[in-house]
Amino acid sequence: MDTIKVLNNKNITDVPYFKAIGVASGIKGNNKSDLCVIYSEKPCIAAGTFTTNKVKAAPVLLDLKHIESENIYAIVANSGNANACTGDDGYEKAYLMAECTAKHLKIKPEEVLVASTGVIGVPLPIDKVMFGIEKAFSILPKSDANKAIDAIMTTDTVQKKIFVEFMLDKKKVTICAIAKGSGMIHPNMATMLSFIVTDANITKDLLNKALKESVKDSYNMISVDRDTSTNDMALLLANGASGNTLISSENSDYEVFKKALHYVNVEISKMIAKDGEGATKLIEAKVFGASSSRDAKVAAKSVITSNLVKAAVFGSDANWGRIICALGYSAAEIDPSKVDISFSNNDSKVETCLKGTGLNFDEEAAKKILDGDHVIIEVNLNNGKFNATAWGCDLTYDYVKINGSYRS
């Protein structure tokens, strides 16, 4: 079983036959990149997961139809405007984005997926978007993957990307994901925007299955502010260029592919959580010993979404009482008299609660852990055999500042 190799110097355009560029179309102004095109010179099969928010942005509604196409070649995405709550006009503009991209690639509009992120309820400035698409294709096929990532960022402070390679059927296979996400992150079936590309040769049904199974334990297990966006999506394109034997059953090759895809999605999820708006720390909640998989996930997410827990981590306060409180009001089945809680990092661990009762623990040692930029909260419910992990971030003064002036 095969080793997954992470290559930090590689990017989305290092996956064979994929091209990408980002340009400034004028949506954001100040010559900031705000439109990207990603496409494959070979036809792809595609899978996607989308926001469960009842209010869905126009690009999401469009993609729910286009994702069913036999072939997908491209993704076109803009930042600075969500094209959400914009009615029929917004849907028509999302289609125009696909149509304009398709014209340049000499393909059908339904073979293009569309994404937008930014302010909700403002009409999409389609003239600027069209200008941006024309500008992008005046540069392509010359690629610049970093500019493509920049073009989908809003309040993000760092780029989010990961590139892995592994072996399937004695063929080298690659997967790369780029993403944006900082605020309004509490996904259910998707993330903010995550674009994943691979040269694996796999059927559409199994690509869908692998993505949906992975999303449950990656993007769906992160939260920054408990707000599920109108625009959330994770898109996965596979062009089959690696030449591995077609994965058409849930065999060992499928398991290897699924493992690599899940690794990519988990790492991107952690990057998004760590870059929460104003965040200074990544919080990782590990729950053990739950009576069901659902209870484990519910308990872990309750810990990382608690504002009191998040604020305590920001202040390096080992206030385990807030953690057991969050477990208690969650929908998970727990027996408080069985719960153990500890704080840890990669170097040390401090137990603070045993069987629901506080311990006389070393406050300074706990504070040292909490002062770090990656805080692990371990909870053992001692109630079963199921485990789960969720990721979030601390709650800082800057979160309020950023979101108090987002439109300005």
Curated annotation (Swiss-Prot):
Keywords (A to Z) from UniProt: Acyltransferase, Amino-acid biosynthesis, Arginine biosynthesis, Autocatalytic cleavage, Cytoplasm, Multifunctional enzyme, Transferase
Location of the protein in the cell: Cytoplasm
Residues the record marks as active site: T191
Site feature (Involved in the stabilization of negative charge on the oxyanion by the formation of the oxyanion hole) residues: T117, G118
Single Gene Ontology BP annotation: ornithine biosynthetic process
EC numbers: 2.3.1.35, 2.3.1.1
Keyword check for Acyltransferase: yes
GO cellular component, as recorded: cytoplasm
Coiled coil: none
One Gene Ontology term of the molecular function aspect: glutamate N-acetyltransferase activity
Recorded metabolic or biological pathway in which this protein acts: Amino-acid biosynthesis; L-arginine biosynthesis; L-ornithine and N-acetyl-L-glutamate from L-glutamate and N(2)-acetyl-L-ornithine (cyclic): step 1/1; Amino-acid biosynthesis; L-arginine biosynthesis; N(2)-acetyl-L-ornithine from L-glutamate: step 1/4
Reaction(s) catalysed by this chain's protein: N(2)-acetyl-L-ornithine + L-glutamate = N-acetyl-L-glutamate + L-ornithine; L-glutamate + acetyl-CoA = N-acetyl-L-glutamate + CoA + H(+)
Ligand binding (substrate): T154, K180, T191, E277, N403, S408
Record site: Cleavage: A190, T191
Enzyme kind, highest EC tier: transferase
Keyword Signal assigned: no
InterPro entries cross-referenced by the UniProt entry: Arg_biosynth_ArgJ, ArgJ-like_dom_sf, ArgJ_beta_C
Oligomeric and partner information: Heterotetramer of two alpha and two beta chains.
UniProt family annotation: Belongs to the ArgJ family.
UniProt cross-references to HAMAP family, sorted A to Z: ArgJ
Function description: Catalyzes two activities which are involved in the cyclic version of arginine biosynthesis: the synthesis of N-acetylglutamate from glutamate and acetyl-CoA as the acetyl donor, and of ornithine by transacetylation between N(2)-acetylornithine and glutamate.
PANTHER family named among the record's database cross-references: ARGININE BIOSYNTHESIS BIFUNCTIONAL PROTEIN ARGJ (PTHR23100), ARGININE BIOSYNTHESIS BIFUNCTIONAL PROTEIN ARGJ, MITOCHONDRIAL (PTHR23100:SF0)
Protein name (record): Arginine biosynthesis bifunctional protein ArgJ 1
UniProt organism field: Clostridium acetobutylicum (strain ATCC 824 / DSM 792 / JCM 1419 / IAM 19013 / LMG 5710 / NBRC 13948 / NRRL B-527 / VKM B-1787 / 2291 / W)
Lineage of producing organism: Bacteria, Bacillati, Bacillota, Clostridia, Eubacteriales
Gene that encodes it: argJ1
